[in-house]
Amino acid sequence: MDGPFAEPTNTREAILGAAFRALRKHGYASVTIQRIGDEFDKSPSLVYHHYDGKDDLLVDLMGFLLDEFEASISDSGDPPPVGGGDSQPVDESAPERSARDELDIYLTAAVDPASLDGAYAPDAQFVTVMTELRAQAANDEAYREHFDRSDRVFGEYLERLVREAAAETEAPDGHAAGASPPSVPVEEVVATLQTFATGGMFRWTTTNGGAWVDDSRAGIDGYLERVLPLVETDEAD
C-alpha cells in the first residue's frame, strides 16, 4: 500500500514512500533504516545519505503528510483519505456532506476508525502508527514540534467546521426571563474536540474496545447538540 506515494516525483518522495510502507508493516518500535531500505527500489545507502537516522526520517514523513493534508483542505475543503487506505473512489453523485457530518467523521475516526467505510475512511493501521509516533513527543523535541504544528493545522480545520456546523444549527430560544444563553467561543469547542480525539485515539489503540466507545460518542454528541447553537459564528477581526 503506497498511499500518497504511489508515484514519487523525486528521491525524497521515494524514500518517504518506503518509510511509509515499512512503518505500517512493522510499527514504530520495530521499523529500522534497514527495513525502510528494504522497501526502497534504489540503493539503501541513499536513505543514509539523506537522513541522520530513523527519527529524522519519520519526522520528515509526518511533515510531508501534514503538508498534503493542509493543501487538500485549502484546495477543496475536504480532507484526503487518512493514511492512504484501500479507499473507494469518491462518488461525485453522492450528497454533499454537511459540516456536522464532517465533525461526526472526525470524531468516529478517533474512537472507532474501523467502523467507517467509503472514500474518506481512515486506515486503522495508520491510526495506530500515528498514535505510536505521537507518544514519542513525550521525550523528543522534534516530534513535539511536529505535533504542535499538527494540532494547529487540525485546529484551524475544525474551527471552520464548527463555525459552519453552528451556522447550520437553529439558535436556542431565550430563557423564560427573556435572556439568551451566553455564547461559547469557537476556540473552546475546538480544544474540547481535539482533546477528545487525541485521548480517544490513544484509548482505541491500547485497549480491546468496549462500551466506552459508544458511551464516549454519546457524550460528545450530546455536548455538540448543546453547544453548537451557542457558538459564536463570526470570526474575530
Name each region found by the language model.
Residues L16, G155-E159, R163, V190, ...:
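An amphipathic alpha-helix signature
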Residues T11, K54, L61, L65, ...:
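Hydrophobic/aromatic residues within well-ordered alpha-helical segments
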Residues T128-T131, T169:
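Extracellular/lumenal glycan-associated context and N-glycosylation machinery
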Residues G3, P8-A14, A18-F64:
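Helix-turn-helix
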Residues D60, S74-V127, V186-L193:
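Hydrophobic alpha-helical connector segments
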Residues M1-N10, P80-D91, A171-S180, E232-D237:
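N-terminal intrinsically disordered/low-complexity leader segments
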Residues A142-D148, R152, A167-D237:
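Hydrophobic/aromatic-rich alpha-helical bundle segments in the mid-to-C-terminal region
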Residues Q136-E141:
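Short loop-to-helix capping motifs
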